[in-house]
Amino acid sequence: MRYPWLRLAIFIVGCLFPLWWLYEAAMNLLGPDPGKILMDRLGLGALIFLLITLSMTPLQKLTGWSGWIVVRRQLGLWCFAYIVLHLLCYLFFILGLDWGQFAVELRKRPYIIVGALGFIGLLALAVTSNRYSQRRLGGRWKKLHKLVYVILGLGLLHFLWIVRSDLREWAIYAVIGGFLMVLRVPAVARRVPRIMGRRGRVAS
């Protein structure tokens, strides 16, 4: 296994935050509605993991270090894990497993539909994020995994719909997401290594 310490560090960080939040909830440090706080933090954590995952390819191109790509799948799976926990918090703490209320929520809060679509997309990517699926799908695998940018857009829209009144934090993530999308445009992606190469030659 390549870069085991980096993989271990990501695993520890991925576990640490939910465990710490659970500790805060157990100690009554999350206020009167700890379930909602947990749900919100896990959703935001998933968005952050998604942005970090999408930054791995540009970082590899900029630095030439293969470690970024090696941990990309692991980061993506942590994003999915946080989304699953986010969804479970919603089902248990917000709905109380009342499926009749779920239908009402869908009508009243369309952002839940947007979030559900993002979850379905992430589920498809998580299930196929293995070498077996790569071999079976062939060229279609890359096309499928480009869906991650649609998922990012859905995640940002879901977040925007929830915050509405205070857009400052949302704007930070939206700018980062937009920048990462621009870096994936073929014309831009081709120029980035050249720009870095020119800087390296100037510095030397």
UniProtKB/Swiss-Prot annotation:
Compartments (UniProt record): Cell inner membrane
GO molecular function, one term: oxidoreductase activity, acting on diphenols and related substances as donors
This protein's UniProt keywords: Cell inner membrane, Cell membrane, Electron transport, Flavoprotein, FMN, Heme, Iron, Membrane, Metal-binding, Transmembrane, Transmembrane helix, Transport
Domain of life assignment: Bacteria
Requisite cofactors: FMN; heme b
Protein name per UniProt: Protein-methionine-sulfoxide reductase heme-binding subunit MsrQ
Organism: Pseudomonas putida (strain W619)
GO biological process per UniProt: protein repair
Family membership noted in the UniProt record: Belongs to the MsrQ family.
Membrane-spanning segments: 10-30, 42-62, 75-95, 110-130, 143-163, 169-189
Pfam families: Ferric_reduct
GO cellular component: plasma membrane
Subunit annotation: Heterodimer of a catalytic subunit (MsrP) and a heme-binding subunit (MsrQ).
InterPro entries on file: Fe3_Rdtase_TM_dom (IPR013130), MsrQ-like (IPR022837)
